[in-house]
Every structure is written in C-alpha cells, then in structure tokens.
Amino acid sequence: LDYPYIDGLDGFVSELDDFVKDGWGIADHQKSYGGKDHTWTSIEIIPLIVTYGTKKAKQGLRGELNEEYTKRFPIIENIINQITTFDDCLWLAVAKVSPKIGTIKRHSDKGIDKMNAGIQIGKTARIHYCLRSNPEAYFELQDLQGGTNTYHMKQGEYWYMDKRKPHAVHNKGDTSRYHMIFDMKITQTVLDNLII
C-alpha cells in the first residue's frame, strides 16, 4: 500500500523503547507462537480481549484504546489516520523482534475475531506498518499452493497481510525489527481511500 512517508520514525521507536522499558511482553493470545526463547515481544495499544465461547472457540473483543501511548506519541494516530481511524481499529500493537535470532513462529490468525478477514466492506484487514527494520529481517507468507513468499518490508511502508494464511517473521540482522500491526474494519471510506 503506497502512502506518504511519515518523518520521525527512528526517534519514535527510540522514545517508545525508553518509555516501555521492561514492559514489552507477549499477550496471552500470542504465546503459542512466541517460541521457547521468546525472541519477540509486543505492546498492545488497543488490546484484543480473548474470550471463549461455549464450544471453547476463541473470540476476540476490542479492548479500550490505551491513551497513555497515544497522548505521549501523537505519531501513532498520524500513522493510523493515513488509512483508517482508531474507532475502526479492532486491535493495534507494536511488535519488536530481537536481532540475530528473532523469530515469530509460523502461525495463522484465523478465528480470533468473529468477522471474516478480507478486503470487502464489513470484513477486517490486517495491516503491517514498518517502523524500523534491517535488510536481514523478513516476513514469510504461505500461498494457497503451499509455496513460501518472502518479503522485506522497509521503514515507512504499509503492507496488507492475509492473516488467515500461515506466516512467520525472522530477524537475522544486527538491530531489532519494529512493526505497528493493526486489524481494521473495511468500510466504504477505507476502500475509497486505499492507495494500492
């Protein structure tokens, strides 16, 4: 997705890291693909509250916007408002993948929210926004034929990702990889403003 580059990303990432300090963690609904070494962590700005239905099926409910982050870092809203609004975000997080050995194990995110994923009105879309990366950090996405596609996402780029397909992240570089990740409602306004 091609949107204008937002200045100040390196400063934002450094300040966010200083602000969060040891508060980086892994949400309960993400622990199964955290790996035994926990080489990645995240913070949730709009948390996903996972509940279980009568058949033990996972359901995700949108939590409250954590204004502690958005008031301190207005750039977060600037990033979101290029493509959607906080009101239409169902989940918003920043993920940090460690250097050299950082891995988010292969997984798919289907079934967490009750709405179907996709780029149609009434569905939800997963967007990755690259805050900071390096040439040796990459994203793997399985296609329907069983092949693996590798993507090197660059700072300031928005990427749509079909979260229903198996995917993984690897960081073999010397610096941490930071992405802002959000699930958003697809509305007519979003479709009208999509720049692909």
Describe each model-derived feature in a short phrase:
Residues 1-87:
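Non-heme Fe(II)/2-oxoglutarate
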Residues 130-154:
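A short beta-strand-loop-beta hairpin characteristic of the jelly-roll/cupin
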